[in-house]
Amino acid sequence: MAYINATLRSTLMGRSVAVSLYFPNDYPETVVPEIRGVVTLLHGYTNSGQDWLQMSSACRYAADNGLILVAPSCENSFYCDMVYGDAWYTFVTEELPVLLNRFFKLPTEREKNFIAGLSMGGYGAMMVGLNHPERYAGVASFSGAVDLALMFEKGRDLPQLRQQFVPVFGQDLTLPDQYDLHKLAVKASGLPAEKQPKLLFTCGMQDDAVYEIRTQNTALYNTMQPLPFANYRYLTWPGNHEWKFWDRSLVYAIDYFLENGYAEQKLGDWRSEVQTAP
């Protein structure tokens, strides 16, 4: 295996950006004979891409399935081109793929590229994936802040929350159509089935304090239900805004992307009977 903490120079933003990568060159050939694809993992607010490799079992899950992981650090940008800050959306969607291909020759085929994220990164994964369905075969959001309009409304009464959004969206907290997941879902659902990405979002049943994350995810699901999506899924189980939940969510996402029964295998491992030595 190989872990790489790269620092890539962004000409677009005139600065360096940290990107963590994992390459699974030691997976069992009898199970996975080749690299199956690349999963881009987006981090949450106040976090970094490296958290995915340090706080979860993402690397082990990637090794089991022959997947390369790419985890860029995009600050508190919500993966948007900020009103008062850097152009992170353009970096993630335009410049980063070029840099990764130049330095690491990663697979570029749509069927081998997936994107997932947690919390702020869950929103980012959905937003990027729905804006670019031609690039990703699968998109997953874990405990995603998927309804920013609702959060803007809450921010009017919570100055601390409002201040999280002002650098990204401006003083009037305007949400452009290209960043509105409800509108993006309607647009993407009009594509032919074979051009739609698989969509998965998960949320813990107890994840509704302060930011009403579960309420946000349920609202997005309700928007999507009547739309002609070919392949989407909303999973929820007991849990909160925490790594334990996101780790399990990644297992379900890999299984959903690859359709290889991986989730059932891991659940079987977790349920294995524990015996106490005499």
Model-inferred region functions:
Residues M1-P278:
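Non-catalytic cap/lid and distal C-terminal segments of serine-dependent acyl enzymes
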